[in-house]
Amino acid sequence: MATLAYSIEVEGLEDETLVVRGFHGQESLSNSVFLGQACYGFRYQMQLASRVSNLTADQMVDKRAELKLYRNSQLVQRVHGIVRAFSQGDIGHHHTFYQLTLVPALERLSLRHNSRIFQKQTVPEILSILLQEMGIHDYAFALKRDCVQREFCVQYRESDIDFLHRLAAEEGLVYSFVHEAGKHTLYFSDASDSLSKLPEPIPYNALAGGTMDTPYIHGLTYRTQAEVSEVQLKDYSFKKPAYSFLQTVQGTELDYQQTRYQHFDAPGRYKDDVNGAAFSQIRLDYLRRHAHTATGQSNEPLLRAGYKFDLQEHLDPAMNRDWVVVSINHQGEQPQALQEEGGSGATTYNNQFSLIPGHLHWRAEPQPKPQVDGPMIATVVGPEGEEIFCDEHGRVKIHFPWDRYSNGNEQSSCWVRVSQGWAGSQYGFIAIPRIGHEVIVSFLNGDPDQPIITGRTYHATNTPPYTLPEHKTKTVLRTETHQGEGFNELSFEDQAGKEQIYLHAQKDFDGLIENDHTTVIRHDQHLTVENDQFTQIKHNQHLTVEGESRTLVKLDCSSEIGGSLQQKIGSKAIYDAGTEVHLKAGNKLVLEAGNELTIKAGGSFIKVDAGGVHVVGSAINLNSGGSAGSGSGYGGKMAELPQGVDKAKTPQEIELAAVTPTQQSMSPLLKARQIEALKGPAPVCEVCEEAKGN
């Protein structure tokens, strides 16, 4: 008959300081619950005794410990971990009773809570950081699928262990432990064929009783139940807005159930087909993890969670196959540990386990992702020396106040999309938040991994363009010159009696009107050009001045007319030249007056009127020599043409959606009538009022 024995070693204590009275432990693939408490791979409650009555928590808690199991004096199993809890019980004549809880070093991550951002890292890389921060270096990954790098991954107000479980479950990773002398190794895998396998098969004994030298399994129950038969996930990416990202995965081994149990979910938390297909399969594996299970009991201490084994000698040949241990509970009793105070019972060991067939993949339960309660405040960041930093999509980098690891530069976040007031295909509104601006950040579906800027706010340093509340009636759009001093502005003053639209261009102001431009000014217009003005009218110009017209030219004035110049003056036409007036006609010059025509120079004159022609001078010379006087001749300058305005690029042609009657714009005829109505003196557009009435 086999003999069993248990012992425990605790870091810093002499061997055999403690003896094992009994233990009750649980192991599981990834996390589970044991006696109402979280079990992170394994958790053992141990009843101990010692002839030392003054052991303290300082000597026990957070120390490494190792439970050893012997069969026929041979070490067959060990459990290595750290002491999470320690308590002292009754003090007897020879022994003091103690209890301790043995857990993996991984449980230390449950005592850390954080918020931080990981960028451009895979899940194994992120998990490695979490483990190494706690001094855990005994870990390994055995993965069949390469995890895709995550652009932006946030640990948001959650413990390190919850964050680890969440990421691992998303990628289909489960963990278990390999126990060796003096250490335990955390082992991540994503497929059952990556798990270790016991070297020898374990026999099944349905009629077992008493104690046998050979370990065996008994009480095996196989269970089949209907589960989800199909998973369909969907998501969206702004980089491929027309692509559905729909992924569908069908279950296998469905002969015993209906195939119409579809599980649809969106968003699927992926942005490409590779991840979408993998996540869909992982979801299906999880939802079907209880479709084929088995439970049983044994006295084989080599059975551990995360191991595979072959069963043999079962009466049902289908059961003699490979199995994966999903979870197992161990119980051991050692009454003889108390020696003279102990009972006469033998040392015992047994376990109860749950299994899945070896070809199936066990998936951990997906952990709920932290939800952001509402919008957050962040600051736009970028490289030193830059004022505006964005990518081709108008996205910017931001820094959250809670991100204590950020340096407040372009590495602080991923590229974050910015909501704009209007966004179409190459048309709409665009205003890029600048470095240092405070923005309001929302999160798609409350997901901290998907921030989007939905607003901007002023604060004590970034103040409004005008002081408040003094200028509370102003609506302002003011920009700031990039890499310089100055601003552009369009503002509206709405104070009664002071209403105003103000436009300021720091440098140039260009306008391009493809058709008509109509302006009606009810009062004065003032125009000051501090340098040159150039105007070109390619067809006709009509100018009507119903009062006076005054022009002051302080230097020369040139006018060149390609055709005729005709002027009609209702009263007088008076020209006053300081030195000379020169009239020249290429063919003929006619001066005509209704009553009188006078030519006067140097005290002499010629006067023509109804009474005749009067010539008066100191001397009148007819054909007596001399020559005609000459004028200066034409010296006018040609007008220069104005600069053109570059036309904005026309949006690329796109296929427009069908327009319903309720979406139709007003008819072109109505627009034309409105323009004509605006040319009239009425203060209200009669055509507009008519349209409202209809």
UniProtKB/Swiss-Prot annotation:
It is found in: Secreted. One of its GO terms (cellular component) is extracellular region. The keyword Secreted applies. Keywords: Secreted. Pfam families: Gp5_trimer_C (PF22178), Phage_base_V (PF04717), Phage_GPD (PF05954). Disruption phenotype: Mutants are unable to secrete VasX. SUPFAM superfamilies: gp5 N-terminal domain-like, Phage fibre proteins, Phage tail proteins. It comes from the Bacteria. InterPro entries: Gp5/Vgr_OB, Gp5_Vgr_C, T6SS_RhsGE_Vgr_subset, T6SS_Vgr_RhsGE, T6SS_VgrG/RHS, Vgr_OB-fold_dom_sf. Part of the type VI secretion system specialized secretion system, which delivers several virulence factors in both prokaryotic and eukaryotic cells during infection. Forms the spike at the tip of the elongating tube formed by haemolysin co-regulated protein Hcp. Allows the delivery of the VasX antibacterial toxin to target cells where it exerts its toxicity. Belongs to the VgrG protein family. PANTHER family: PTHR32305, TYPE VI SECRETION SYSTEM SPIKE PROTEIN VGRG3. This is Type VI secretion system spike protein VgrG2. The lineage of its organism: Bacteria, Pseudomonadati, Pseudomonadota, Gammaproteobacteria, Vibrionales. The gene is vgrG2.
